[in-house]
């Protein structure tokens, strides 16, 4: 029947040993190679400590002083100080709103007695009485009029030994400096027509942002920095502020050295790294109040971004190292909330991000030196994860944060089904941040780090920007590509596809009709018919079968049969040479050995349930290695697998070995087996449940463990497709004959098909429960 596929795999999986040996010998072969040192070799010299080379810094430093600029009328930007630096007496600056205020600032040299001077202010000649009694300080006088034809009046003064003056538009006021240095302060005048206020300076000036007002005050009181007082500083026209900035080519390829065949290229690149964490959350069995594990998993992310007008396709893999294991135990009762282990990354942990993109820099990244990178920091904050309890309020794990600081960059390799990709591995060290993480409704609080429950905090990805640079030895002909050396790496892409395949397989369980399942289970499915649902199977059947056998050889089922075969060989060697060993089923001494081990366990283990669990673990091996006419659990398992393969769109040649191996181990975990002795039936399940009953009346009787062990040794083991509870329920509600009972006990497929065709709800429900257990 359908379980023939498993028997074929068990019989043929050992035939690939020679192929494995040849492959291992080939991969472990050593080869002597003579290298002719070229112009890039450092032969005959001590080891060289390579420096990082040229790494462009993209940090923008905003200067405090913007200037100096040549005198010219312009619209002073709001929120910026104009710092004037006149060199001779006279009108320094004029400012007006053309409606209610005209301001003209005059500079008077030291030691001037009261006298009348003529100044040109706003295009008109005006006579003003001025004086400066100080012998050391220069005097700025603010002359203001409030009408076009009005007279000027003195409003304020600034005595300065630095000969500097400041003016700013902000908050509908015109601010200036008054008082005496080194204690000059600002003062503001309301302006009626604020938007149209114009300023005309008559000396060189600087522009300082209001955010740097403290620096401006420092200059007014104590003078400009020495660098501004040299003849090398030349004022420029204020129109230069309107020149549009030109983008610098930050991403560049530099030829360091070149010969006829090889050249050294330095690649400087901007980079945007996006990554995310993944996790695995596993619940324990039982009533649903306990969790077994919450751990980090490697996560892949693919994205596009623009670099100098070019769209770059990038791929990252994020993994963690140095995790910290925490646990919580709310009590010993089955209904007490508990987490056996949950992982947290803290200061002693590291985060690795492997980055690759499709740009020219990564095309020949094989022989690399002078690798360096500068990256920004990124903060990762945890989100909420609710532990869904069957009853009561749910505990919630929330909070936790860490900051990732760059700690270095190395080369790494990402391996896919089609190509090996040399990539950059960015290493980040961690620092814990606020907030701490807690588990509500428990004593767990104020712990620091990032737990694995929800490390992405609702974000699709985290992003880091920066630059990297390295020098690569590449072929001089750009059309050539350096071959990438073979490397053994984790196949993250296949694992991602398997996860998608598992999810699709589990969703397909609801689409399998029970009648179709029985039909498939009755077919003699071999390896080729199992593969018939895969595209291009005929061309690749041989290699696919070899891959399936190689993978299946390491499964738990194959290992168990291998151990059993060894024990049978030992038992057979102890039998007289004249005895003919025809099959596993006829070698009674080997199974007697199992019986003896089971009887020894009777005295050691306290409960019959534990004894049944121990012996039932071998019942599948007893059944699978002997031919029986009835349907067994492996027939159903193989039939479900075949039905899902035919419907799946994710399965392919590479995923099939993992699928079949995982199905052999995980499909139908809760199995029950029975042995029949006349009118008595003994039934034992992998969950520790056991029954003994009369076939005629389905009346229970005491379970004799020793007799059960003897029957296992000498009698056929049958899969309890229709277990005792279902059988009794069927008899109580519908009534069955003695012959029907025997046929159901033997798992006769024709009788099962008859009940299903009659749409019997009890039998259909039992088969559907078995189908739902076929999950990856």
From Swiss-Prot:
The record marks 231-232, 241-242 as: Cleavage. Residues 65-224 are annotated as: Spike head. The record marks 246-247 as: Probable cleavage. GO terms for biological process: permeabilization of host organelle membrane involved in viral entry into host cell; virion attachment to host cell. Keywords: Capsid protein, Coiled coil, Disulfide bond, Hemagglutinin, Host cell membrane, Host cytoplasm, Host cytoskeleton, Host endoplasmic reticulum, Host membrane, Host-virus interaction, Membrane, Outer capsid protein, Viral attachment to host cell, Viral penetration into host cytoplasm, Viral penetration via permeabilization of host membrane, Virion, Virus entry into host cell. A motif (KID motif) lies at residues 644-646. Gene3D superfamilies: 1.20.5.170, 2.60.120.200. The keyword Coiled coil applies. This strain probably does not use sialic acid to attach to the host cell. This is Outer capsid protein VP4. The lineage of its organism: Viruses, Riboviria, Orthornavirae, Duplornaviricota, Resentoviricetes.
